[in-house]
């Protein structure tokens, strides 16, 4: 068990950057060359997990070690929701962050991992503020939207980030006497609801993930209030991964400059083939 403030401090260092999914050492090197602040090591990007079906589990430790060996930036890896043994294995490998991820098949449909029991910081997804505060209450040091990973469709990530912002503004404007009832309705820890009321933000960094496929998508999430962006299938399922990766990194840095966004969006080749979000939703996994 370690200090949550230290874990949050490590997450704060990723602000204003891009975290990229990679499935091998070569992709990890491309991501680092493009300016990624971290990589997510996994065997299959979410688009392939959707296409292949079956049970998606933690990646092979050999793959994770290979990716860690070629990059000097932080390496994240995914564990299934509730699968604390996968998390123990990942921590033993020395990964920098663990993502308790809805992209993988849940191992426990009632309980998430008790993240306070680990020294490594955890990333968790959310669709609304109540879900975010529950994960933070369990020890998460970094929150992201769930979006709909593997679709190239930004609509769910936008909906979820707007909902979190709406919920934060509601609590910020509430009377202090209403906070306990709000905590009850949101199923959120009371002390965290009080924090949001006082500070008007989450107590941990708030990133965006799920469906980011273009520089414009990344800039959109930043303008909506995300502090960094995860990109999964959108880079290495595109025609020119290195060029697109560099463009998305630039878009996150200059998200408020339409001229630069236009420049970096030019001649990127075909993006990943997107799909609609009217099928099984990964974002409905977990609670």
From Swiss-Prot:
SUPFAM superfamilies tied to this protein: Ribulose-phoshate binding barrel (SSF51366)
Protein known as: Pyridoxal 5'-phosphate synthase subunit PdxS
Molecular function as annotated in GO: pyridoxal 5'-phosphate synthase (glutamine hydrolysing) activity
Family the entry assigns: Belongs to the PdxS/SNZ family.
Residues binding D-glyceraldehyde 3-phosphate: 162
One GO term of the biological process aspect: pyridoxal phosphate biosynthetic process
Record text on subunit structure and interactions: In the presence of PdxT, forms a dodecamer of heterodimers.
Keyword vocabulary terms for this entry: Lyase, Pyridoxal phosphate, Schiff base
Regions crossing the membrane: none
Catalytic activity: aldehydo-D-ribose 5-phosphate + D-glyceraldehyde 3-phosphate + L-glutamine = pyridoxal 5'-phosphate + L-glutamate + phosphate + 3 H2O + H(+)
InterPro entries on file: Aldolase_TIM, PdxS/SNZ, PdxS/SNZ_N, RibuloseP-bd_barrel
KW Lyase (keyword) present: yes
Role, per record: Catalyzes the formation of pyridoxal 5'-phosphate from ribose 5-phosphate (RBP), glyceraldehyde 3-phosphate (G3P) and ammonia. The ammonia is provided by the PdxT subunit. Can also use ribulose 5-phosphate and dihydroxyacetone phosphate as substrates, resulting from enzyme-catalyzed isomerization of RBP and G3P, respectively.
């Amino acid at each position: 068990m370690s200090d949550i403030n230290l874990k949050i401090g490590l997450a704060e260092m990723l602000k204003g950057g891009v975290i990229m999914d990679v499935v091998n050492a070569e992709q990890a090197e491309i991501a680092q060359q493009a300016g990624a602040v971290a990589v997510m090591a996994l065997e299959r990007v979410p688009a392939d997990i959707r296409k292949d079906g079956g049970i998606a589990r933690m990646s092979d430790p050999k793959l994770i070690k290979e990716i860690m060996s070629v990059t000097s930036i932080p390496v994240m890896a995914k564990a299934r929701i509730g699968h604390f043994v996968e998390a123990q294995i990942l921590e033993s490998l020395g990964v920098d962050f663990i993502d308790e991820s809805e992209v993988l098949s849940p191992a426990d449909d009632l309980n998430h991992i008790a993240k306070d029991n680990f020294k490594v910081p955890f990333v968790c997804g959310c669709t609304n503020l109540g879900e975010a505060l529950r994960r933070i209450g369990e020890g998460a040091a970094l929150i992201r939207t769930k979006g709909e990973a593997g679709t190239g469709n930004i609509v769910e990530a936008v909906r979820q980030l707007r909902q979190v912002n709406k919920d934060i503004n509601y609590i910020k404007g509430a009377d202090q006497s209403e906070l306990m009832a709000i905590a009850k309705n949101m199923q959120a820890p009371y002390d965290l609801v009080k924090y949001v009321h006082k500070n008007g933000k989450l107590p941990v960094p708030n990133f965006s993930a799920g469906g980011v496929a273009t520089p414009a998508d990344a800039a959109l999430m930043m303008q909506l209030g995300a502090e960094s962006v995860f990109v999964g299938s959108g880079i290495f399922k595109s025609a020119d991964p290195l060029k697109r990766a560099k463009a998305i990194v630039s878009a996150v840095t200059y998200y408020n400059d339409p001229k630069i966004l236009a420049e970096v969006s030019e001649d990127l080749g075909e993006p990943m083939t997107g799909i609609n979000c009217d099928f099984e939703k990964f974002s409905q996994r977990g609670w």
